[in-house]
Structure formats: structure tokens, C-alpha cells
């Protein structure tokens, strides 16, 4: 120990005798570079605890990515992050992009509350204590636009008809705030929303001639679009003012096409639409007869604007995962399904008749009025479902087994693609083998991507639930360490663990978010 400590003491004495920045001789690789030399990689500042302060002083607008070398999401972000830096540099933007290796700089990770990777924080004017959490997209142009709207105006000031018309003509989605007083609090609300609505272009005016030009007599936010109705107005409440949440919901709802085709480019926006009911028309777009159905589908859509999102799924395209989610085969097209994203309940037309404007309208009304019962997916019960130590449950036998009053049933709800589920599989098998001679204990598993339950919905994987023997259909969710010892203690104590047991381990979300979504794309520490 003393042999290791002596060089450290000598180094401290030498540093105490030399002013920082005036040391002579070459630096060792482990030493930090002088303050004026913050290293760069692909146009990105590489920061440490010694250089973050300097970067904040030199750059009034600094976006910092906290990453981990082993993080797959970080690796996917890296090229887009570098492209964004290049785009902003070409524009001579005041924004600088930087990164911090979280595991190598634990002091910084702790200081800024980093618990998952990647985490991005935006620092303004050297303020180290209150950075803004980055909430934008994970592709280069989206990153650049998010930053542009924070260092520049988020809405263009419109002075005349020509400027307004040029803005409207130049983009698919344009939002213009018509306010008689630009110093009103409602304008601040409008500009705050404009910072984050990156798929729309924003304008702002107080000019009376523009109010007259667009037929307005009071403060109004107008969405101009090059499809469907062409325009949607959101009048500002004269007493309550402009509510950020209400305006946001309005813009999201009316910026969606009345009918949207599901594909990799639209999926993220479909799930972000905040409309809980989605009506899906499954068609084979290579067939003329199927394409003709889209007309009637579109004619029904306006009646349910804001209540039901109308989506077309082409079974001839790469949409097998959507078919699987609804338990359908491509041969079932054309057919309708409605799903509520909050409850995950799915509905199918009862009569199975032709798809027409009238039948679509009637089906939507029936579901919204609670007149249609949801259907549940289930695989067939395997002949050998109870022959292995881990019993196989499906939708059709779950109730009978899980709520058997003579058995204590411990169930793993999993997804075949879930990494966490695969990691815990050996411990689950070992648990089943350990208790296979206990007649009152059943260890089971259920593929929750192929089987649905009326009793509850499964939202993450793995989900572990314990169904103790006795009346009352009691359910206890297991939220502790996933290993044989802790599982055993839980079972032996009747579904209870001592309070000092470790907290729950992470679970994968269900369903998995789209690859380009900003949600769910982080790795926990």
C-alpha cells in the first residue's frame, strides 16, 4: 500500500509548487489537458469534470450528451449527433454539442442526476444548475431544429399578407398565432409550444390587415395544412386565455391526416397522436377492389375527428407485426379492427359484413357506446402444457390455473424478444425444478404478446405475478431481484419479502416503441 501511495504524494507536492498551466515537460496520458484544449471528436467536445466549466464559459448554448460506451442506443445516436453538430457549425450557430462518458465521469453523472443513457441536457448562458432536459428527436435535423428554436425565434414575425402567404405556401403544416397584443401572456404560451412542435412551422402577427385577410375578429391560432380540410381554427378563450395543453392536443389532432397509412415513417406520429381509439382497415393494396374501400373509409373519418384515428394497414407490405398483434392473417383482409391504446382492448365487427362508409360508422359508434365486447387473443393450449417443471399458460387456460383456490401459482409474463426475460429464464427454470414436488405450488409462464387476459393488462416484460391459494382472486405483483434465492424466499413467505430486499429490476416496455421514437430509447444504469 505504501509503495502505491508514495508516487501520489510526490505528485501532489510537485503540483502544489507549480501554478496550474505552467508545468514543464510532457503530460502523461492520464493527466487532464490544459483548460484551453478541450478535445473534439467528429465536431463534438469531449468533456470531463475538469473541462465542463470551461465549456460552459466559452459556449452560451451547450448541448451535452451523457453516454456509455456499451450503450446500444448511444451508439445509434452517435452519427446523428455528429451530423447535427456539422449542420449547426455550417450555419455558424452559437450552439456547441458536447458529450460526457458517464461511467468514466461518475461525478458529473451524479451531479446532473443521470440514471439512464443516453441523457441529453441543454445549458444556457453558463448556467450549470438548471439545464433543460432534451426532449427532441434522435436524428440530425431534428436535433438541430430543436436547438434552433431555443437560440433563435421559435415563430416568424409576419408583417404583411405576402409574408404570411409565403410561409403558408412553403410548408405542409404552418401554425400562425393571430394576437392583437404581442405582449400578452397568451403569446408566451404560443411561443413555448412552438419550441417543441418541430414538425410544424410557426408564425406570429398582430397586424389588423392579416386578421381581416383570414376572416378573424379575435385572437386565434390557425393551423394551415395542404391536405384534408386545409385549415383548422383554435379561438383563444377570452376569459381563460390560451391553455398550452388544449392547444397542443388540438394541433396534434388536426395535423394528422384523416386517414393515415401505417408504415415506418408514420408509426411514431400515430402513437404520439394522443387519440386513444385507433380504427385499422387491413387491405391488400395490390388489389384494386381493396383500394376502392379506402374511399368509404375516408368518408367516415371526419365524423370521428379527435375521437378515433383512422389507419390503413397494407397486408402486402412489411406489417406482419401488426397482423400478429391483432391475431390476424393476411388472408383476413379486408377487415376492420379497433383498439384502445389505454386499455389495449381490441374490437372486431360482429356481423363481418362488407366494409362500407355506413358499416364503418356504425361499428365506431357501437364501440364508443360500449355495445361491442372486446376480444382476447389466445394461443391453443399445448397438449403437454403441464409436463415440464415450468407450466405453459395461454389465454384459454389462464383463469382455470391461476385462480385455482387450491394452488399457489407464480407466473412469469414474458415476450419472446425481451432480453430481461431471457436473462432470468435459468433462474425461473431452477425455481420450477426446486418446487416441482410441492403439490400446492405451480411455476408457470405466459407469452403476453400472443395471449391477452380479461383480468388485467401486461405493460412490461418480464412481469411476475403471484396468485395465492384461497378465495378472492388475490394477485400480488413481484417487484424484487430476479434470482433463485429471492424467488424462493418470496414463495416460502407466502408472497411477501422482508422490507430490506432489493428494489425491482428494469422491465422492457410493451409494446416496444418504434425505432425512431423519442420515447423508450434509453438504457438504464
From Swiss-Prot:
The record lists its disulfide bonds as 71-74, 418-421
Q: Where is the signal peptide?
A: 1-21
Q: Specify where the region named Disordered lies, as residue ranges.
A: 498-525
Q: Which reaction does it catalyse?
A: Catalyzes the rearrangement of -S-S- bonds in proteins
- GO BP terms, alphabetized: protein folding; response to endoplasmic reticulum stress
Superkingdom, taxonomy of origin: Eukaryota
The record's Gene3D superfamilies line, in alphabetical order, gives: Glutaredoxin (3.40.30.10)
Provide the protein name: Protein disulfide-isomerase A2
Taxonomic source organism = Pongo abelii (Sumatran orangutan)
Q: What is the lineage of its organism?
A: Eukaryota, Metazoa, Chordata, Craniata, Vertebrata
